[in-house]
Amino acid sequence: MAPEEGDQAMSHEDKAACSSLNTTSSTELFDGAPSSENERLRIRQAAVDAMHHGSPKIDPQIWTDVTSHLSGSTTIDARQRDIFFENLTVHGKGSSLQIQKTVLSALLYPIAYPVKRLMSIVGNKKPHNDRRTILHGFNGILNSGELLLVLGRPGSGCSTFLKSLCGYLEGLDLDPVSEIQYRGVPFRVMIEKYRGDLVYNQEADHHFPNLTVGQTLEFAAHARAPHNQVGNSSRDQYVKSVVKVVMDTFGLSHTYDTNVGNDFVPGVSGGERKRVRTDTIVGMNSIAETVLSRTSIAAWDNSTRGLDAATAVDFVRSLRTSAKLAGSCHAVAVYQASEGLYNTFDKVILLYEGREIYFGPRQGAVAYFETMGWKRPPQQVSADFLTAITNPGERQPQVGMENAVPRTPVEFESYWKNSPEHAELETSMRQYKMKTPLDSSEEIKLDEIKRLEQSNHARISSPYLLSVPMQIRLCIVRAWQRTRNDIPALIATAVAQTVVSLIIGSLFYNIPENTAGLGQRASVLFLAVLTNALISLLEITTLYSQRLIVEKQAAYAFVHPFTEAIAEVIVDFPIKLFRCLLSAIIVYFLANLRREASHFFIYIMFQLTAVMTMATIFRTLATVTRTIGQAMALAGVVIICIAVYTGFTVPQFDMPPWFGWIRWLNPIFYTFEGIVSNEFHGRHFECVEYIPSLSFEQGLSFTCSYVGSIAGERYVSGDAYIAGSYDYSYDHVWRNYGILVAFLVFFYVLYFWLTELIPGTTPAHEVLIFRHGGVLQRLVRGDLERGESIRLQEVKSLASEVHSSKAEQKNTFSWKGLSYDIPVKGGEKRLLDDVSGWVKPGSLTALMGVSGAGKTTLMNVLARRMTIGVVTGDMFVNGRELDASFARNIGYVQQQDLHVETCTIREALRFSAALRQPQSVSMEEKYNFVEEVIQLLGMQNFAEAVIGSPGDGLNMEQRKLLSIGVELAAKPQLLIFLDEPTSGLDSRSSWAICAFMRKLADHGQPVLATIHQPSAVLFEQFDRLLFLAKGGRTVYFGDIGKQARTVLEYLEDKGARHCGPTENPAEYMLEVIGGGTQGQSTSIDWVQAWKRSTEYNKLLGELDILASSPSNGVSADPYMVGEFAMPLLVQFYHVMKRDLQQYYRQPEYILAKFGAGVFCGVFIGFSFWKSDNSSQGFQNVLFSLFLLCTIFSTLVNQIMPKFLSRRTLYELRERPARTYSWKVFILCQILVELPWQTLLGICTWASFYFSVYGSGQSSQRQGLVLLFTVQFFIFASTFAQLVVAAVPSVVLGSMLATFTFLLCLLFNGTMQPPSALPRFWIFMNRVSPLTYYVGGISATALHGRPIHCSNRELRVFDPPQGQNCGQYLAEYLKTAQGTLSNPLSTDQCQYCPLRVADQYLAARDISWDDRWRNFGIFWVYIIFNVIGAVLLYYLFRVLPYIRRNRTQKSRN
């Protein structure tokens, strides 16, 4: 398109977008600078002063024009880039078809895969090509200042094309034959050196929720601010100016100091959040990307999704203005484009199953395909016509051209490559390559510009504008802002650590400074260092929460990932220092540790360094993994290794040689030895127990009964004690600290390096996953033989015929005076205000309005699905009040497609039909009806496909069809609600769904649907319109009329401008009431105009008639008035079957669970390999049980996210639809875990029991230990459900579970015998369920085993002269618990303090006689968990829901 044609094409749109300008016309805007130097200086000064609150708004287009002229035309011209691509071919990893994995297939894979490969080799078969071609040889040129419209159906390769243009190739493979250049700059050079000039704007939003909108945008502006700022203003002035212009432009000025927020952090509203990105403002999807990131090339992937028509047009017009003024070029993928939006673009590319079938001027696209032989239906917009060409079920050949037109993607591609238009494109490409050769001249120009824009110390080869120190400073500021904005989280963490420290300190309160406190001192130090270090596990969650943000900013060339990592470390240091000091002071002084200043500060120093080292280790683990599940699994391995090989639970001299080396790689080993040596060195502890008793003077013929004692001494040296107990030495203290610091430095360097080196998350590429045995053979051949993606049956017969079994409906749903208020800070906010209307049989009603008008809110209110707030007004079905069956008798297709990801489409539909259709209908009839729905929706080819998660399973279109199918399968008796059923779909799918809704309405089904961007043809499918303005107030309710004349005449009669014959009525209506990015002001009060209209009075009259004349539309059948269609037992059967199936089909969850349990068992078993019968051996056995308990936390944290995801599905979709009872839900969630937990208990028992206890015990003992182990795992699952049943999030549930588990673990008698507990804490030993678990197993396994002291444990002393050992100790041995090894010896008497394991257990209040009692008590705890989970779920999740419904009903 010629430049003058582009200006001409844009004149109307740009005038509309610039209509608010008072002093500068659009002609002035496009033709040059503002009319006078004074005007230019005025705007420049206003821009400089923009950081002052209360300054007037600055028009963004004039501001951009002025700043462009101030920057200099040379700079702008040099930065402008074109996109040239030739033979662009892109491959993806893996095939388009996969078979669903199950637990069995995952277990057999190590055997099945080698066998399969061997058979392939023997059979001389070609190995499967594990990649698929997504794009096939694309060609084209996009010049600077141009806009490219990317058209194609979902799955055609639009996203891949956009990513390829901007170098976002993670998970993709660019074929070597491909050539991409940017006005003489090669692809690789552009990506490496000028990455900030290429921006791919994906659909998902990622922000730091605790940053304000202003802070978020200022960071982006700082990162890309040129060193030579406009007009020589300071960097801060430039940033403030740009941010103010952007926020003024898109109506976000009022959110400057408001947190961005997310689903869990309060912040701006969903619509406003959609408009905010770390580099730009999206949602209105405006020019802010160019203003803030200053990109030359931008690709926008379906960025208009979810926006109303007026806002979508405003967004593209702003891109048009940017391209005109700054010379940028934009490629925009749009699935639903109106004619006005289509005409804004310069060029169009059309994709058909990964093949380019047209690239060229926008004006010639339609004519090209008409010349080819395709017929354009009347009133079909250009973009819809082009997209329809790629749909065999929609395109129509011209008469006589049926056999001449191409049909397959390959034929279309061949036709295109042999066309004159393609020849012209090839000529242009040859001329372009001659004009702009790939030499270094353009690169030199860019380097010169970048050198001017870069800071002084930035590398010229770096794509970043800021130097590394400047990036670090910028990231430090942002990290501090995030920390300051999230004070509650800091307080919560500090309080949690304080509470844990208080518990540990009080558990060992005032340890005596004699030998009775020796073991207690070591124990409290072990717990202190371990808990402080393990708190750092939260670093994994923190890193994953910001990972996508950091990756995106690196892609936009804002900051290096490692600079963000360095900033985090620096900002975290004072926080960690404060927490360490707080924890140390509490534990140190409560436990009465060594009260000397030097030793206290050495303790602090070790603890702080250990915490920072462990935090860095966990961050490194998070960096090298791709999912948080992988990171947590690795962290679990690290934790168990650290806990076992610290040197406390297994002393160095007892460590097995095969695992003993781990201690040298364990930072906590060096920390523990350092603080233990620091505590005990140079101290003498008075002995409190002697052998024999000191009843008289005995010279040197006695010894203290503690390790490290010397015959004749009345004290024990601290150095001797730690040497004898742990093989520690004070000489290692500073060596250990040096090693600890070395660990810290090493992991810092490794973490920073890996953060920069390792790519982050791999983007998901939608592939179909079929149930084993459910995939059609022709699909297998099509995919595996050709390596191409599967193309599913077109949705072509949605409106062809509605199933005959659908009875004609006679129900009318009406509402009058509906208002909805929600509580906000300082009062209430009204979201809906006096909304009235009806939906009658045979009518299709559209619900429209500007973004944020309350369309989804009204839909939820009408469906009685609001969870907060107060609804007032009346709702009736056939003049009757709504009863308990209303929710079940309607179909509600939500905007979010929520499904069980492991089910197939057929299974999901059958589940809905089985539980929501009446009991009187046989199961065979229900399943036959499901097959009708599958045929109706065109899903026969993939009915056995697994739903999967977004990006890994069904695509967006298929999910939307499934959501509709689930509601249809239920045979709703009253009406169907559809919330944004066409959102994210292409025009063909949108048309098919609307045509299907039309057919349902024609058969008597009342239908109410919200729509955002309807084309004129699609809009005509609706009979009636409810039009809302901001604030949830009615603008119009009534008939639409043919070609929308009824509603248009109403608006024009009230003062709106005339709607042109080529305008889209939906866009026109939104414009005249003040829609768009900034909500253009209007002089007409449309709400009051509606209240004064005759149409409003007719509405009220009709509502009165409907309310006063109840019809007999609702049956008296008990099914119609009951809350659920099926009895509880039937509900339980179907839900339990689905849940068991879901677990079996998620091997990653089951195998992770079993992997953790079995690894823990094997590792502990081999670490405590066949402990001997010494006192230390028995203590090792007890510690092995203590450490085995630590798997509890891993299991609980695995179960809770699973429970919450199922609860979300139930509470958002299945409970409101009254699919099944909450009793069935909670019971099935508890029971479905039990088979796997039982099997896990058996596997874990087998992996550790024989390693630790040997195989010589009786089968009765082995069986009882097995029962206790199975009990433990059942307790873990029921405990997880008890905790998570009532909490709103996994984070809170994890904190509660971890804290409760810590209490149970600390007070089970292992670390501190009950007799040594402070009086206050004795009850906790009895309350802790782990007391009975540890007591039961240890008593069963150790009862009756004799003790044979090792040489370290024997107490050695000489008898008096003239006596042997037996004579000397004869009286003492009558009452003593121990044994004398050498009674006849006259020197070196060897006394073992204990003779049998039961004596050791008795000190911990463990008895053989209590084993079955403990077994029974443990079951009581399990039963308590089950009852508690049911009760808590009812009290916190069900009862409030019931009360809300009752409240709404009473107010109605």
Curated annotation (Swiss-Prot):
<feature type="domain" description="ABC transporter 1">
    <location>
        <begin position="116"/>
        <end position="378"/>
    </location>
</feature>
<dbReference type="InterPro" id="IPR010929">
    <property type="entry name" value="PDR_CDR_ABC"/>
</dbReference>
<keyword id="KW-0812">Transmembrane</keyword>
<dbReference type="Pfam" id="PF06422">
    <property type="entry name" value="PDR_CDR"/>
</dbReference>
<keyword id="KW-0067">ATP-binding</keyword>
<dbReference type="GO" id="GO:0016887">
    <property type="term" value="F:ATP hydrolysis activity"/>
</dbReference>
<dbReference type="InterPro" id="IPR027417">
    <property type="entry name" value="P-loop_NTPase"/>
</dbReference>
<feature type="transmembrane region" description="Helical">
    <location>
        <begin position="1322"/>
        <end position="1344"/>
    </location>
</feature>
<dbReference type="InterPro" id="IPR003439">
    <property type="entry name" value="ABC_transporter-like_ATP-bd"/>
</dbReference>
<feature type="transmembrane region" description="Helical">
    <location>
        <begin position="1264"/>
        <end position="1284"/>
    </location>
</feature>
<feature type="transmembrane region" description="Helical">
    <location>
        <begin position="569"/>
        <end position="589"/>
    </location>
</feature>
<dbReference type="InterPro" id="IPR034003">
    <property type="entry name" value="ABCG_PDR_2"/>
</dbReference>
<dbReference type="GO" id="GO:0005524">
    <property type="term" value="F:ATP binding"/>
</dbReference>
<dbReference type="Pfam" id="PF19055">
    <property type="entry name" value="ABC2_membrane_7"/>
</dbReference>
<feature type="region of interest" description="Disordered">
    <location>
        <begin position="1"/>
        <end position="38"/>
    </location>
</feature>
<keyword id="KW-0472">Membrane</keyword>
<feature type="binding site">
    <location>
        <begin position="849"/>
        <end position="856"/>
    </location>
    <ligand>
        <name>ATP</name>
    </ligand>
</feature>
<feature type="transmembrane region" description="Helical">
    <location>
        <begin position="1181"/>
        <end position="1201"/>
    </location>
</feature>
<feature type="domain" description="ABC transporter 2">
    <location>
        <begin position="813"/>
        <end position="1055"/>
    </location>
</feature>
<comment type="function">
    <text>ABC-type transporter; part of the gene cluster that mediates the biosynthesis of the meroterpenoid compound andrastin A, a promising antitumoral compound. Is required for the production of andrastin A but does not have a significant role in its secretion.</text>
</comment>
<dbReference type="InterPro" id="IPR003593">
    <property type="entry name" value="AAA+_ATPase"/>
</dbReference>
<feature type="transmembrane region" description="Helical">
    <location>
        <begin position="631"/>
        <end position="651"/>
    </location>
</feature>
<keyword id="KW-0547">Nucleotide-binding</keyword>
<feature type="transmembrane region" description="Helical">
    <location>
        <begin position="1149"/>
        <end position="1169"/>
    </location>
</feature>
<keyword id="KW-0813">Transport</keyword>
<dbReference type="Pfam" id="PF00005">
    <property type="entry name" value="ABC_tran"/>
</dbReference>
<feature type="transmembrane region" description="Helical">
    <location>
        <begin position="1415"/>
        <end position="1435"/>
    </location>
</feature>
<dbReference type="Pfam" id="PF01061">
    <property type="entry name" value="ABC2_membrane"/>
</dbReference>
<feature type="transmembrane region" description="Helical">
    <location>
        <begin position="598"/>
        <end position="618"/>
    </location>
</feature>
<comment type="similarity">
    <text>Belongs to the ABC transporter superfamily. ABCG family. PDR (TC 3.A.1.205) subfamily.</text>
</comment>
<dbReference type="InterPro" id="IPR034001">
    <property type="entry name" value="ABCG_PDR_1"/>
</dbReference>
<dbReference type="InterPro" id="IPR013525">
    <property type="entry name" value="ABC2_TM"/>
</dbReference>
<keyword id="KW-0677">Repeat</keyword>
<feature type="transmembrane region" description="Helical">
    <location>
        <begin position="487"/>
        <end position="507"/>
    </location>
</feature>
<dbReference type="InterPro" id="IPR043926">
    <property type="entry name" value="ABCG_dom"/>
</dbReference>
<feature type="transmembrane region" description="Helical">
    <location>
        <begin position="738"/>
        <end position="758"/>
    </location>
</feature>
<feature type="transmembrane region" description="Helical">
    <location>
        <begin position="1224"/>
        <end position="1244"/>
    </location>
</feature>
<keyword id="KW-1133">Transmembrane helix</keyword>
<feature type="transmembrane region" description="Helical">
    <location>
        <begin position="524"/>
        <end position="544"/>
    </location>
</feature>
<dbReference type="GO" id="GO:0140359">
    <property type="term" value="F:ABC-type transporter activity"/>
</dbReference>
<feature type="transmembrane region" description="Helical">
    <location>
        <begin position="1287"/>
        <end position="1307"/>
    </location>
</feature>
<dbReference type="GO" id="GO:0016020">
    <property type="term" value="C:membrane"/>
</dbReference>
